[in-house]
């Protein structure tokens, strides 16, 4: 069913018909299209456009369409809107043709997308909270498991595995706050904007918005139909969240190698090689890392689509949906897989703690010890560097150098230096909020 055509002399070319169609992907909006249509019908009734009997017929017909919406094959209609209207007219006759009064597909689809995204945001919030809770539980378990902390992928200072996990908790908490803030801009209703210039029918937009659970309405009809900031903002959020997952996955992939040997991936989230029998590959983590680029691509798609569009609606904007849907699907699956994967890793605490004892990661605390003895930090830093070089040349850790050797570098060094640079004591002495302190 076409929702237009009166001013045309020729039928649409079959090639153009296929090119123009969006039903194969926007059918996902069916539930939300029907929700919006029911609310719009109630707005038309309140405005005196529909009788009570007509409203009841339309509402009943739309609900039946939703109940019968399991598709055996993709319909041949142009889009989800024309599909719903065709079914409605088939069910209730010409009364169904009144539904589109005072409405354009431009404000209709913008409303559908916001309703859909609103629900998806709630689902993603649940997934993020589950991941955060999982990491918090693991951090409690490993709060005293000492491991190397890295900068430039070089051993830097000792931390705990629990502290490391909580670093990602902070990242995902920021992602969660972005979702909450975004909802203020997503949950605004454009319905009533018409094609771009509103409508002559006195539809109470605030009433319709309240029926659909929107917090507010758009205040400019041209912006209402042409705004896709909410799609861009969501995909920006999704890209940042995927980036956090990807960084986490990169470290897990590295740590699962024999070169690090800090963790082992569970069989349920690993695969083998078709040629090399010994292989156990961290494919779940690698796929999440790879799919991050896919979500970045979704964001770039909509940014590129929108960058040169004049006001108001343009058909280019049909391209927003596949990017949005793909970004949502990819993020949701990645969050679910990652949460289950991280719960099942085997943490090799002995290897972590062994690695923390090497690499001269107590050098900073050696310098701090000298500062506490009255030496300026910059001088203490230089002395500590010379001690590290001396220890490296002898293939010894600092703590295995004799007191006599250490005193060659500064006469303020006493026997208490060994307590000051002990790895466990280092973490017990951390004082600032946010440090990896062991109690």
Curated annotation (Swiss-Prot):
Kindly tell me the pathway this chain contributes to. Amino-acid biosynthesis; L-arginine biosynthesis; L-arginine from L-ornithine and carbamoyl phosphate: step 3/3
Q: Which GO terms describe its biological process?
A: arginine biosynthetic process via ornithine; L-arginine biosynthetic process
According to UniProt, the reaction catalysed is: 2-(N(omega)-L-arginino)succinate = fumarate + L-arginine
Q: Would the keyword Lyase turn up in this protein's UniProt record?
A: yes
- Record GO terms (molecular function): argininosuccinate lyase activity
Task: List the subcellular locations.
Answer: Cytoplasm
Q: Read off the InterPro entries from this record.
A: Arg_succ_lyase_C, Argininosuccinate_lyase, Fumarase/histidase_N, Fumarate_lyase_CS, Fumarate_lyase_fam, Fumarate_lyase_N, L-Aspartase-like
Annotated Gene Ontology cellular component terms:
cytosol
EC class = lyase
**SUPFAM superfamilies the record matches:** L-aspartase-like
Q: Where does the UniProt entry say this protein principally localizes?
A: cytoplasm
EC number, as in UniProt:
4.3.2.1
Q: State the UniProt keywords alphabetically.
A: Amino-acid biosynthesis, Arginine biosynthesis, Cytoplasm, Lyase
Q: Which family does it belong to?
A: Belongs to the lyase 1 family. Argininosuccinate lyase subfamily.
What protein does this entry describe?
Argininosuccinate lyase
Species annotation: Caldanaerobacter subterraneus subsp. tengcongensis (strain DSM 15242 / JCM 11007 / NBRC 100824 / MB4)
Taxonomic placement:
Bacteria, Bacillati, Bacillota, Clostridia, Thermoanaerobacterales
């Amino acid at each position: 069913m076409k929702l237009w055509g009166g001013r045309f002399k020729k039928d649409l070319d079959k090639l153009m018909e296929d090119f123009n169609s969006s039903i194969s992907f926007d059918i996902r909006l069916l539930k939300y299209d029907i929700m919006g249509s029911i609310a719009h019908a109630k707005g038309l009734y309140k405005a005196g456009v529909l009788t009570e009997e007509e409203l009841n017929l339309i509402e009943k017909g739309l609900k039946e369409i939703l109940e019968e919406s399991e598709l055996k094959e993709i319909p041949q209609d142009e889009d989800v809107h024309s599909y719903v209207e065709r079914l409605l007219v088939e069910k209730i006759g010409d009364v169904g043709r009144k539904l589109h009064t005072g409405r354009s597909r431009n404000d209709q689809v913008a409303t559908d997308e916001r309703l859909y995204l609103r629900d998806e945001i709630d689902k993603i919030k649940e997934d993020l909270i589950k991941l955060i809770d999982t990491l918090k539980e693991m951090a409690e378990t490993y709060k005293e498991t000492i491991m190397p902390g890295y900068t430039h992928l070089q051993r830097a200072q000792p931390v705990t595995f629990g502290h490391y996990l909580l670093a990602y908790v902070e990242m995902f908490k920021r992602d969660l706050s972005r979702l909450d803030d975004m909802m203020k801009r997503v949950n605004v209703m454009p319905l009533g904007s018409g094609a771009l210039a509103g409508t002559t029918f006195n539809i109470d937009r605030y009433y319709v918005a309240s029926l659909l659970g929107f917090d507010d309405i758009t205040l400019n009809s041209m912006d209402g139909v042409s705004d896709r900031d909410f799609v861009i903002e969501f995909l920006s959020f999704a890209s940042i969240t995927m980036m956090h997952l990807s960084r986490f996955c990169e470290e897990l992939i590295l740590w699962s190698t024999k070169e690090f040997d800090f963790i082992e991936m569970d069989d349920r989230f690993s695969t083998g090689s078709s040629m090399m029998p010994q292989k156990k590959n961290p494919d779940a983590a690698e796929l999440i890392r790879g799919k991050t680029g896919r979500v970045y691509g979704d964001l770039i798609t909509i940014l590129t689509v929108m960058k040169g569009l004049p006001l108001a609606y343009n058909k280019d904007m049909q391209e927003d949906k596949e990017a949005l849907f793909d970004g949502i699907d990819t993020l949701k699956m990645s969050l679910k897989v990652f949460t289950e994967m991280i719960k099942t890793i085997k943490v090799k605490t002995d290897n972590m703690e062994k690695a923390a004892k090497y690499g001269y990661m107590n050098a900073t605390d050696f310098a701090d010890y000298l500062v506490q003895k009255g030496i300026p930090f910059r001088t203490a830093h230089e002395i500590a560097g010379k001690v590290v070089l001396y220890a490296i040349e002898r293939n010894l850790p600092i703590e295995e150098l004799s007191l006599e050797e250490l005193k060659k570098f500064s006469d303020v060094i006493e026997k208490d230096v060994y307590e000051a640079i002990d790895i466990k004591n280092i973490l017990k002495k951390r004082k600032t909020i946010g440090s990896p302190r062991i109690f």
